[in-house]
Amino acid sequence: MCIRDSVNSFYKPFFFRHVETFLDSPQPVAEYIPLKHFLHRFTRSIFWELEDMIPFSNHPLYRCLWGWLGAPEVSLLKLVQGPVIRRSSVYAHVVQESIMPIRRLPEGIRKFDDWFGAYPLLVFPVRIFNRGEHSGMLKPRPEECEPPNRTSGLWVDLGAYGVPRDVKQGQVWDAKSSVRAMEHWTRDAGGFQALYTDIFCTPLELREMFDFTLMDAARKRLGGDDAFPEVYDKVRSEDGISDLSVELAAEKAAGKTVDGKKGK
C-alpha cells in the first residue's frame, strides 16, 4: 500500500530523520510524496545542518510551535558573522560538493572520507548535456558522455555538510589543503565544484574546471569587462578566509595566465 506523505509540512520530522526510520523497518514501505515536498525535502533542515545550529530543532514541541518559521536564512547568518567567527566556522565546519562522473563515485566517497570524514553524505544524480561550443560553463568531456551519440552523461553530486572528523576528535582540520585537494581531484576527474561553497582555488584553476568561452565572448561583445566583476570575484571567499598568495606566486613564476592576461 502506498500512502501520501507531505514530508515538508512544518510539523513533520526532518526528511533525513524520517528516512532513518526505514532502516529499522521489518517490512518494505512505499510512500507517495507530492512533487513540491520532494523538491524541498532538505529545505527545512538545511540538509542536516540545522541540528548543529539548533540541537532541538527536530523535537516535536519545537516543530509544532516554531517549525512554521522555517530554517534560518544562511546568507543572513553569514552577513551578521564577524570575520573572526566566519573564519573559525570555515575551519571547523565543512560545506562542499563535488559533481563527478558517476563512474568515479566509489573513489569520490573514499576521498571524501579522507578529506572531510563528515556524514551522512548527499548523493544526487545530475545529467549534463554536451552541446559542443554552446554548452556554456558546464562542458562535459565527450568520453564521459554516453555512447553512441555522446550527447549527455550521468554525473553525481556528492556533498558533505557538517563537522569534520578531525574537529570532532579535537584535532586540527586543515580546511584549505583538504578543499584544494578536493578541487584538484574534481578537475582531474572532469567534474565541477558547487560554487556556493567556500572555494580555495585560484582564478586560473576555476577556469580549468569551467568553460568560460561563451562568458568571455559575451562580456567582450557587451562591454562587460569594465562594468561587471569576473565570475571568480563573485564566488570567491571573503578576504581573510584563505591566503592564496603562495599559489598565485607559483602560477606567476610558471608563466601561467588567464587567457593571456596577468593572473589576479
Task: Please state what every model-predicted region is.
Residues 4-264:
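Noncatalytic alpha-helical scaffold of FAD-dependent oxidoreductases
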